[in-house]
Amino acid sequence: MTNNYSEEDQIIPNEGWHVIHLFYQIDHAQWSILSEEEQLKAKTDLTKLIQDIRSTPNTQLLSFSIVTPKADIGFMLLTDDLHQANLFEKQLTIALGPDILTPSFSYLSMTETGDYMTTPEEYGQNVLQKERGLTKDTVEYNDAIDEFNKHMTKYTNDKLYPSMPDWPVFCFYSMAKRRG
């Protein structure tokens, strides 16, 4: 499966990445019809596809087993281009062969900073002045604000462009928050 769009058609947000959680049930009846050689080839094809996706710039893919009867296997895909995410989703769905993986549910979201981040002014007033007793515009106060700003720059970047570890277990829950 190849891209049928140009770089000009990419859907890349101003900040952050697209995130897709994909959950599949394995049709064990369909899987059992395949010979051992066909099953091995299908597993090899899926492994190669995962490696190919993981080697794509600005893209991460986590794969995991689901511990409930709602699904058997899942993927968490983070990437900058929505068209690329859509292509990867289609490729993953058919990677083991037609009708082997049945989507049970999926979620599309984006990484974001959130509306609850402390501003330098709030940090200065609430922490530096009230808690630590520092006076505004002193060297110690300004150094602390500079450190806070460096920390928040890294924090913001990590939220928008996370580096997800390939952990054997993670918790997922869908967010029901309405966005404006």
Predicted feature locations:
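N-terminal, charge-rich interaction modules
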Residues: 3-23, 145-180
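A short linear-motif detector with a strong N-terminal bias
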Residues: 1-3, 42, 52-56, 83-87, ...
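An N-terminus-focused feature that recognizes amino-terminal "leader" regions
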Residues: 2-65
